[in-house]
């Protein structure tokens, strides 16, 4: 079973119960109808990245759906949290890419998102044998990766939120969702 399509999504939920908060975050991301199975970090060869709407149109409620899921939650008022998915796509579509998940506290959306993107790009770069200086800033390494001719694109999706002011559970999710076959 190799996914032929994938899409990114994100969401936030707030509720007095932790599990219900997670459910509401999945609803916000539009993936609550599926039995989600978390998988690791490989973007399959020739897997087409599509819009959330296109991907969802091929799934049916109750389907077992694989995804790379980043999840974070808190009931601490005003605590900033993030969940991010980073993706690195190789030039040669017959090769696999990388997907990373990152969840953190205290990071703004751009910081958490770029961290996840950097992580995915670095994992792909090391498997392709691209030489780079790990001490370089992400934007400098990004240029090295793309100039190598092996990495076509990198991107991320990130959801941030501050914990509910009244101490309700707040959950953030970000996911790369795979579509294996039309349900």
Curated annotation (Swiss-Prot):
Superkingdom of the source species: Archaea
GO biological process: arginine catabolic process
Family label: Belongs to the PdaD family.
E.C. number(s) listed in UniProt: 4.1.1.19
Top-tier EC class: lyase
Stated name of the protein: Pyruvoyl-dependent arginine decarboxylase 2
Gene3D superfamilies: Pyruvoyl-Dependent Histidine Decarboxylase, subunit B (3.50.20.10)
Cofactor details (free text): Binds 1 pyruvoyl group covalently per subunit.
Transmembrane segments: none
Keywords: Decarboxylase, Lyase, Pyruvate
Substrates-to-products reaction catalysed: L-arginine + H(+) = agmatine + CO2
InterPro entries reported for this sequence: Pyr-dep_his/arg-deCO2ase (IPR016104), Pyr-dep_his/arg-deCO2ase_sand (IPR016105), Pyruvoyl-dep_arg_deCO2ase (IPR002724)
Record-annotated site: Cleavage (non-hydrolytic): 40-41
Gene giving rise to this polypeptide: pdaD2
Co-factor(s): pyruvate
Modified residues (Pyruvic acid (Ser)): 41
Entry's Gene Ontology molecular function annotations: arginine decarboxylase activity
